């Protein structure tokens, strides 16, 4: 998921960026 710190530069992050929840909270941009 996009909330986890270990998610940086992982393929899961790329998927997380496309999720509406992540875009709304801007978590994917900061932590991925």
Curated annotation (Swiss-Prot):
Q: Where in the cell is it found?
A: Nucleus; Chromosome
Keyword vocabulary terms for this entry: Chromosome, Developmental protein, Differentiation, DNA condensation, DNA-binding, Nucleosome core, Nucleus, Spermatogenesis
GO BP terms, alphabetized: cell differentiation; chromosome condensation; spermatogenesis
Q: Where is this region: Disordered?
A: 1-32
DNA-binding listed as a keyword: yes
Gene Ontology terms: cellular component: nucleosome; nucleus
Tissues in which the protein is found: Testis.
Is this entry keyworded Nucleus?
Answer: yes
Q: Name one GO molecular function term.
A: DNA binding
Predominant location category: nucleus
Function of the protein:
Protamines substitute for histones in the chromatin of sperm during the haploid phase of spermatogenesis. They compact sperm DNA into a highly condensed, stable and inactive complex.
What is the name of the protein in this document?
Protamine S4
Organism from which the protein derives = Scyliorhinus canicula
């Amino acid at each position: 998921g996009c909330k986890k710190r270990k998610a940086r530069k992982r393929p899961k992050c790329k998927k997380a960026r496309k999720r509406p929840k992540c875009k709304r909270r801007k978590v994917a941009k900061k932590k991925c």
